[in-house]
UniProtKB/Swiss-Prot annotation:
Belongs to the Cap5 nuclease family. It is an enzyme of class 3 (hydrolase). Disulfide bonds: none annotated. GO terms for biological process: defense response to virus. It holds the Pfam family SAVED. The keyword ATP-binding does not apply. Keywords: Antiviral defense, Exonuclease, Hydrolase, Nuclease, Nucleotide-binding. Residues 1-185 are annotated as: HNH nuclease domain. Residues 186-378 are annotated as: C-terminal SAVED domain. GO terms for molecular function: exonuclease activity; nucleotide binding. Effector DNase of a CBASS antivirus system. CBASS (cyclic oligonucleotide-based antiphage signaling system) provides immunity against bacteriophage. The CD-NTase protein synthesizes cyclic nucleotides in response to infection; these serve as specific second messenger signals. The signals activate a diverse range of effectors, leading to bacterial cell death and thus abortive phage infection. A type II-short CBASS system. In the presence of its endogenous cyclic nucleotide (synthesized by cognate CD-NTase CdnG) is activated to degrade DNA, probably exonucleolytically. Activated by an AMP-containing cyclic nucleotide(s); however synthetic 3'3'-cGAMP, 3'3'-cAMP-UMP, and c-di-AMP as well as the major in vitro product of CdnG (3'3'-cGMP-UMP), do not activate BdCap5. This is CD-NTase-associated protein 5. InterPro entries: SAVED.
Amino acid sequence: MASVSKSSIPQKVQSALWARAAGRCQYRGCNTDLVGDLVAGRQDGIFGFIAHIVADVEGGPRGDPIRSTQLARSLENLMLMCARHHKLIDLDAVADHPESVLLTMKAEHEGRIAIVAGIDEDRASHVIRFGASICDNEALVSTQAIFSAMPPDRHPASGQRLDLEMVGCAFRDNEPAYWTVQRENLRRQFEAKVRGRVERQEIRHLSVFALAPQPLLIELGRLLCDIVPAVVHQRHREPASWRWASDGPPITFQVTEPDIGLSGSVALKLGVSATVTDARLQAVLGDEAAIWSLCADQPHNDVLRRADDQAAFRRELRRLYDRIKARHGEGTLLHVFPALPASLAVEVGRVWMPKSDLSLRLYDNNRSHGFIRTFDIP
């Protein structure tokens, strides 16, 4: 194992450091694997350097007249580095890397490795990634962002994702063909990549990461249903992350019912990420539309921060499906107008039960045309 230290670091200390670092550079944001090089054809090659936080000599980087000697062979004073970052902290940018900064980097890296290595097999989860173009923007979900959001509760069952997306679709979401093509692609990919493996018990848990127009997210939820336990992650805007946060107060959900005398189509307004007025629904369905609603008290586009709020939404929606059916009868078509965080749109489909709930007609909010009809479920 390579080391530029002037001290003779005992082999057992070197081995312990490599183990704690999992053979990766401990510089924040690097995480380069320092074992093996496929390009050079050396799978057993070791390319890491052991760096001192407090130099082993007084005149070295972050050196100290007393502590340098005391800490020269201490595991807590050593970091595993790639060549670039070892040179950076000891030669090129010493002033930018004081002892406190390096100690924090070391603690963060080793803490993360300890969490991941400590997760047992029962917490393995297969990752579903689904993205579809929203307006003119492709909704891509990066693998690194996905995998880093899962611990400590879950870890990826493998390094492979179950990708259900269709990137580069030539149709736009204001064209009827877009919804037909995207929905059929999603259904076929789900059948090929997910359902069969669930039935063979190869998949026992799913972690879902999805960004797409809301009707397609609802359709994904319908396909998922309750075939296997799943966690649906939410993409947060500030800070950008897929991890659940604990900041912010709980969301207060408000449920409203239509007047008894209304005789038009039955609608469900879901306003959590934005305010949706009844007038926008009436522009589509007419003034006699019977509008039910489940809305956040203070909707905005980054409102969903807590997993508990997602669970609360599921409970409220489940009760609302039942109440709407009881009021309007078995054969009613329910028109759904969503303005939701992505994960809640998926939950709209997961909560819906095909054998007992009303059929749904899904609408999408189009920037130029308002709410437009997309497709029906089932």
